[in-house]
């Protein structure tokens, strides 16, 4: 697992590039994390750090958690997250982790809980086509059809796509592009949509699967380079048209007229 940050989904907007390119973005407010614990191989069998995010009143904590934060001499934190690291010597208790973590990153993985849709049928939940509208079908147009087997095995296998609770599950969207980040206001702008509703908590991490993809910023530069070439061609066209306009117009019937 790579190190990450916990943030809040503010909403969606769009960003305009210099070339006029419009990009849909999701705005995420990042909370700076504080390293609460440092675990080494001698203690745990692996190197890891425990990071606390968000503030919470001590009155909302139980006695065990109150004692834990008093022992660590730090403010109570709402979320505690553990990340495994390879170079444990770089991290110390009390250090803060912020948006600087993604300074050199182009893509990130974002994990959050999807919006709950309640109990849903197979057509909405699993995109089933349903049964026929007529020709012998009655009161089962949106049903899932048969679910069982024969006498052997005589049961429905686990994982069978059926009607049930839809949404309200943690999902990870991989390789979302970072459009820009605002270090002063702790905001990060990510291309595309992120699971969950407004004000829902999200976990942002460095992308696990490294990909080669043209980013929107690179595309913007290419469009700008093309726009710099095309005005010169347009200038040449305008010059030719202006020269034609300057030529005196021939009067009708002037051919073959003797003076």
Predicted features and spans:
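Extended basic (Lys/Arg/His-rich) segments that typically form rRNA-contacting surfaces
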Residues: 1-259
